[in-house]
Amino acid sequence: MSSRVGDLSPQQQEALARFRENLQDLLPILPNADDYFLLRWLRARNFDLQKSEDMLRRHMEFRKQQDLDNIVTWQPPEVIQLYDSGGLCGYDYEGCPVYFNIIGSLDPKGLLLSASKQDMIRKRIKVCELLLHECELQTQKLGRKIEMALMVFDMEGLSLKHLWKPAVEVYQQFFSILEANYPETLKNLIVIRAPKLFPVAFNLVKSFMSEETRRKIVILGDNWKQELTKFISPDQLPVEFGGTMTDPDGNPKCLTKINYGGEVPKSYYLCEQVRLQYEHTRSVGRGSSLQVENEILFPGCVLRWQFASDGGDIGFGVFLKTKMGEQQSAREMTEVLPSQRYNAHMVPEDGSLTCLQAGVYVLRFDNTYSRMHAKKLSYTVEVLLPDKASEETLQSLKAMRPSPTQ
């Protein structure tokens, strides 16, 4: 039994009837009170009536808080409309709408310096509501129920700038909202053009996805254009992605449907920095330095840092220890990121690097040049690990590449 309308076991049919009875007070205000809608919440909680009811009631509170009945007409700030990438374009073979997420050309820092995180997340909630609305239109058009959407994530150009903590938090919160409020609406999440950094990025958001959602993720290899046509008919797929669809003017990217983002002009900036919270606060004495060690167990991990100083600028560099178990000076270690002085007392600094080898990496905060003033340092340092399953998938896809002809 698929636990869908028309394919329910007697126990599931009884659970649906009891679920409807328990929700008598909510039925008049639900966005949809048919069996298809109610079964989404039951499937999401394995037909546990109490858990399903709790989930749906929390969703109705969320709808009220976010004014979801009117969100489709809400217009986000201009900078989000112009530079936040993505778009609804085409339908899969069963008529489900397809939404493209363009990650590489996204300027996360520019967007978050120009708009609030709440507006960034609200725009993504609006996309979810638009997709449900599109499903309803498809249901009316095709004469059969369409209740799921397909998402394509184009990861070409994914880089360390996309791992900036405030930007990652937007996607973490979005996937958390998706799981709690839009169960059983994602048909597949297809990843194309995934670079080596993808497993690290995925590991940052996967804990916010249910196991069911993770099972729906499909990572395509080098022949992704051909593989994509197994999900979406070529006439419903832009030329840019291996199909035959173009804009009316012949543009292969279908710019009238998909926003490809881009760098946000500084004229949109509302502030020079995003307010951050730091995990540690230390004093770096005059004429001294502070070393923060992080052990990297295998290549491919990413070191990510954020820091601010009080009392003046501070030097910063990254080094790799050459001897384990003992303190080393900067000149005794291998320089990975050259040390330089940062005006972190004026603008907080953040950055990251991919560790190419295992070992102990030292983030060195340098105040040796200051003979008069100690510096108060606030900082957060994290080691981002790659998701092993997706890393192995990428490696296996790479191994399947045909050898170049001689």
Curated annotation (Swiss-Prot):
What is a single cellular component term in the Gene Ontology annotation?
cytoplasm
UniProt xrefs under Gene3D superfamilies? CRAL-TRIO lipid binding domain, GOLD domain
SMART domains, sorted: CRAL_TRIO_N, SEC14
The UniProt entry, under InterPro entries, shows: CRAL-TRIO_dom (IPR001251), CRAL-TRIO_dom_sf (IPR036865), CRAL/TRIO_N_dom (IPR011074), CRAL/TRIO_N_dom_sf (IPR036273), GOLD_dom (IPR009038), GOLD_dom_sf (IPR036598), SEC14/CRAL-TRIO_domain (IPR051064)
Keywords on record = Lipid-binding, Transport
Q: Where is the GOLD domain?
A: 252-383
Query: Which superkingdom does the taxonomy of this entry point to?
Result: Eukaryota
What the entry lists under Pfam families is as follows: CRAL_TRIO (PF00650), CRAL_TRIO_N (PF03765)
The free-text function statement in the UniProt record for this protein reads:
Probable hydrophobic ligand-binding protein; may play a role in the transport of hydrophobic ligands like tocopherol, squalene and phospholipids.
Q: What is this protein called?
A: SEC14-like protein 4
Which organism does this record belong to?
Homo sapiens (Human)
Q: What are the leading ranks of the lineage?
A: Eukaryota, Metazoa, Chordata, Craniata, Vertebrata
**Gene this chain is encoded by:** SEC14L4
